[in-house]
Every structure is written in structure tokens, then in C-alpha cells.
Curated annotation (Swiss-Prot):
This is Phenylalanine--tRNA ligase beta subunit. The keyword tRNA processing does not apply. InterPro entries: aa-tRNA-synth_II/BPL/LPL (IPR045864), B3/B4_tRNA-bd (IPR005146), DNA-bd_dom_put_sf (IPR009061), Phe-tRNA-ligase_IIc_bsu (IPR045060), Phe-tRNA-synth_IIc_bsu_arc_euk (IPR004531), Phe-tRNA_synthase-like_B3/B4 (IPR020825), Phe_tRNA_ligase_beta2_arc (IPR022918), PheRS_beta_core (IPR041616). Keywords: Aminoacyl-tRNA synthetase, ATP-binding, Cytoplasm, Ligase, Magnesium, Metal-binding, Nucleotide-binding, Protein biosynthesis. GO terms for cellular component: phenylalanine-tRNA ligase complex.
């Protein structure tokens, strides 16, 4: 969750006495919590970073309630300000973008700017590892700026007056101690410098005193560096939106040394076009909506929209980094209309429901495992890629919110090992199982996986439980084909075969694999593909 707060009287002075009423009304549309007394506190879900400051939030509120539609124009390139990117940065923090914002003195919005910068560092930037933002007073930097590498022996003065070499700053400044791990331990460091080689900032750590901003700054230069192009792209448009919310004029400098593909990806993200089908909108909403009403709702939510048939042309602002497809746009139409204004309809079903065959199979497998003395558990379908070094699922999450949930699992037993590790305080033996989904070779499969953690757990332990389980479902005897199974001891693992079909795997977990979960107790396991075994034995099951 993301929290912003400010004294209520200050906000009323900036935005008017109706600010609390407007924010409360808008909260029922977007979905965030508000507390207010002497201080106004708002707690957001992490999916709308464009709202994480009072200026940007109030901009969207005015668009929604007052129709103050922003006529967005492409960012004009300012050839008077030139940025040169050196090749040396490509091995450290390769991605770069920049913008210029010019207007009246930042004044009372200074703290909001700094807070928004830090919120983006924590959320979009993943604590500065993927992206970091530097904000400078352009009137102090000159019009020629360089993104380059510098010697760790070069001296600089930080924004708060600490002076020393780059190496000393990294090791002793509070920001260096916190973020120095993001730079190589030796060699040169990346830096933003002026034309004379003076350091303006040391991404992703600290800005210099030379280009320090204050309440009187009118002309800003914003640099965005990172290790992830999407994060840099998102931050560019979010920072542009912050300044445009304060009526600043936004331009981009002339940048030399970057691949044109990267700059085009960042530029094209603003007002990218999506074309939701009218039929899809009606299907999701459950009722017909004419073109004029649809366009009205889209404009209230900050889009530029043009009528059309069978599709509507929707231009998505760059700061709406949460919009990934037509479902997100239709969700915004629903928010604008209000779910309470959707007519309720009775659903008529022509027959009584009954369990799917596979659900009957799962129930039978569940009852059998409980009868064998196992306890059922449920773990996440998303797993960390670090669990699955031999990953065969073929489905990875793009831009995961956490590296702990970066792939859709292709095997279940590593998740069960993690669960055992989190419950080491409980007495042994621990016998648990899960019936769940996984992806193998891009196809979804349903599997039963179980682990036995005990001081005497070994390959034969898992084998006896596996035979007891399969005896309930097939008259054929399973055969174990010796094979090295991921995470298992070679010679104590294999594939489970019935007839000509491989239906699963079995093994005793290798001590080195157990150490990754901080487990000292022996563990054995088996994992069976329910789709394979039960389709082949439907007659024997009697379901």
C-alpha cells in the first residue's frame, strides 16, 4: 500500500475547502481509503502510481467531476539542451531518459515533488534497483549535460553538504550506505555531469549540491536512469504528469548516444492507441451502452476517445502505466458509470449443476490422501524462478511486482518444501499434499504432489505411499524408471510409469537442495499428473 499525507489546512489553502469532499467522493470510484482530522491521509492500492501525489490526484478529480480535460500535446524536443550518453554506462545502468519542466517557482509543492520522487523509487523503481530519478535546477547546470562514468577518486559535494570522493560518498553518506550495493564494487561509477565534468548526481544514490533544487526553482532537469527499460519509461511519463499537473511546460532534451529504438519506445508510450470492441464493452458490462455515453465515461477517466464501429479509438496517456489492455479500459468505464447503476438481471440456467468429472477425481484423490494420513495444503501457483532452475513451464510474468512471484510453476513439490521450511516449529513427521495446477511445456496440467518430512524419510517411504495411493485408482502395478529428477539424489529418484505412460515423478530430496530451504530433516516426495492417470483409468474409478 502507498500512503500520502499532508496537513488539512495546507491542502485547503492550495486546492480549496471542498478538497475533502471531492477526495471522498472520488475514493468510491477509484477505491482508496481516506482518514482526515487535522491531517489528510490517503492509502492507495499500488496499481495507480499516477495518483500518488496531491497535485496528480486533484488533476484527475477535476477531470472527472468538472470535465477539465487536458489537451495533451507531444513533448517538444528542446535542442538547446543537449545530453550526451557515453558507451560506458551500458554495462552498469544502461537505460536513460530525461525531461525538462519549466514554469513558476515550485514553492509550496516542493515537498510534494520530493515525496513523489521517493514513492516512485520505492514502487516503480523497486527501491532504486530498476530505476532512479534525479531532479536538478537547470539554471545551475548549463545546457550541456552528460550521462557518463567517472573515477571513484573524483570529488563531489552532495546536496546536503557532505564532501569527498565518489568512493567515500558511496561508503559513508546515508544514501550511499543504503544504495551503494546497486553499483559495482570496483571500477568506475555512472554519473550525471555538466560540460566541465562536475558531478551533478550519482545515480542511483545521491544528487550534488551544485544542481540542488529548492522552493524557488522554476526550471527543472529530470534524469531517469535504470536497469529496466519499462521502469524508466513509466517514471518518465509519471514525472511528466506531475509537472504538467502544476501547469509546467514539458519538453525533452536532445539526447545523443542512445539507441533510437529505446527513445522511440519511451516516446510512443504516451497516447498509445487501444481499440476496445463495442461488443466486448457490452459483454463485460452486461448491458448496451451507446457510443456517446461510452465516450463520455472514457473522457471522465482521463482518456482521449473517438467514436467508431465496431471499435472505439482510445488514446491512453503515458502516465496510465496500469492500462495493459481493453479489460482495463472497460473497467474504467464501469468505474465512471458506477457499478450500482448497472441493472441487475436474473440469470436463468436450464439445468441443475453437477461437478465436473475432474473435480470428482480431485475429491477422490483428496479423500485417499487424507486416508493415508496426509494433510492438505494450498500454495501459490506463482513461484520464484530461483526455485526452478530447470524451469520447463514456459510462462514467465512480465514486470512482476515481486521476484517471489515471477513464473507460473511447472512443479509443485518445491512449494511444499518451502511450506515445510516455514513450519519447522511443528513436530515430525510432517506429511502434506496439494492438488493444484501447473504449466508444463506451455500447457496447464493438474497434479497431486506430496512430501514426507521425517527423520527416517527416504525413497522407499515415498514409494510405499505412492503405491498405496495408486492402488485406489488402477489395477496395474506402477513401475519406477530410474531418472535424475530435479532436486533429488541421483539413484534415488525416477519417473513413475503405468503401462506405456509416464504419469509422475518420485524421489528423495538431495541435502544440497534442502539447504536452500534451511531444512535439515530428510524429505521424500512424489508428484503425479492426475490428467494422465485418471483419463486412462475412468472405468476403474467408477465415477
Amino acid at each position: 500500500m502507498v500512503v500520502i499525507r499532508a496537513p488539512l489546512k495546507e491542502l485547503e489553502g492550495r486546492y480549496g475547502r471542498e478538497i475533502v469532499d471531492l477526495i471522498l467522493r472520488y475514493s468510491s470510484i477509484i477505491g482508496y481509503s481516506v482518514d482526515h482530522d487535522e491531517e489528510l491521509k490517503i492509502e492507495f492500492n499500488p496499481d495507480r502510481p499516477d495518483l500518488f501525489s496531491f497535485p496528480t490526484l486533484m488533476k484527475q478529480i477535476k477531470i472527472f467531476f468538472y470535465g477539465e480535460v487536458e489537451i495533451r500535446k507531444p513533448q517538444i524536443r528542446d535542442d538547446a539542451v543537449k545530453v550526451t550518453v557515453s558507451k560506458g554506462v551500458r554495462d552498469i545502468r544502461p537505460y536513460f531518459s530525461a525531461l525538462i519542466a519549466e514554469g513558476s517557482s515550485i514553492g509550496v509543492h516542493f515537498d510534494e515533488l520530493i515525496n513523489y520522487q521517493e514513492i516512485l523509487h520505492a514502487s516503480i523503481g523497486k527501491d532504486r534497483s530498476k530505476m532512479a530519478i534525479g531532479i536538478h535546477d537547470l539554471e545551475k547546470t548549463g545546457d550541456s549535460i552528460h550521462y557518463t562514468t567517472v573515477s571513484r577518486n573524483q570529488r563531489m559535494q552532495t546536496y546536503d553538504g557532505m564532501e569527498g570522493t565518489v568512493d567515500w560518498i558511496i561508503k559513508n553518506h546515508e544514501k550511499g550506505i543504503a544504495y551503494g550495493r546497486l553499483l559495482p564494487g570496483t571500477g568506475r561509477s555512472v554519473a550525471i555531469t555538466d560540460n566541465e565534468g562536475n558531478i551533478l548526481s550519482l545515480p542511483p544514490i545521491v544528487n550534488s549540491y551544485r544542481s540542488r533544487i529548492d522552493e524557488g526553482t522554476k526550471k527543472f532537469f529530470v534524469d531517469i536512469t535504470g536497469t529496466d527499460l519499462n521502469s524508466v519509461k513509466f517514471a518518465h511519463h509519471l514525472m511528466s504528469n506531475f509537472f504538467s499537473s502544476l501547469k509546467y511546460r514539458i519538453r525533452t532534451p536532445s539526447i545523443d548516444g542512445l539507441p533510437s529504438r529505446e527513445t522511440e519506445i519511451i516516446r510512443a508510450f504516451d497516447f498509445r492507441i487501444m481499440r476496445p470492441a463495442r461488443r466486448s464493452i457490452e459483454r463485460y458490462l452486461g448491458e448496451k451502452m451507446d457510443s456517446e455515453e461510452t465516450i463520455t465515461h472514457l473522457r471522465r477517466m482521463g482518456y482521449v476517445a473517438e467514436p467508431g464501429y465496431p471499435e472505439i479509438a482510445v488514446y491512453v496517456p503515458g502516465y496510465r502505466v496500469d492500462v495493459m489492455g481493453e479489460a482495463d479500459i472497460i473497467e474504467d468505464i464501469l468505474k465512471s458509470k458506477g457499478i450500482e447503476n448497472i441493472e441487475e438481471k436474473q440469470i436463468f440456467i436450464g439445468k441443475f449443476g453437477e461437478p465436473l468429472f475432474m473435480n470428482k477425481v480431485k475429491d477422490l484423490a483428496r479423500d485417499t490422501m487424507i486416508g493415508l494420513g496426509f494433510q492438505e495444503v494450498m500454495t501459490f501457483v506463482l513461484s520464484p524462478a530461483s526455485y526452478l532452475q530447470e524451469y520447463t513451464g514456459g510462462v514467465r510474468i512480465q514486470n512482476p511486482k515481486s521476484e517471489d512471484y515471477s513464473v507460473i510453476r511447472d512443479k509443485i513439490y518445491p512449494d511444499l518444501l518451502d511450506l515445510i521450511a516455514r513450519n519447522k516449529k511443528h513436530s515430525l513427521p510432517q506429511r502434506i499434499f496439494e492438488i493444484g495446477d501447473k504449466i508444463v511445456g506451455g500447457k496447464q496440467r493438474t497434479a497431486l504432489s506430496c512430501v514426507i518430512a521425517d527423520t527416517r524419510s527416504e525413497f522407499s517411504t515415498a514409494k510405499s505411499y505412492m503405491q498405496g495411493f495408486l492402488a485406489r485408482f488402477t489395477s496395474e502395478n506402477p513401475v519406477i524408471v530410474p531418472q535424475m529428477i530435479y532436486g533429488s539424489i541421483d539413484g534415488r529418484s525416477g519417473s513413475i510409469k503405468i503401462g506405456e505412460k509416464i504419469i509422475g515423478v518420485i524421489g528423495e530430496i538431495h541435502p544440497a537442495f534442502l539447504e536452500r530451504f534451511s531444512l535439515a530433516v530428510p524429505v521424500s516426495f512424489f508428484e503425479i499428473d492426475l490428467d494422465e492417470i485418471f483419463i486412462a483409468n475412468m472405468d476403474h474409478l467408477g465415477l
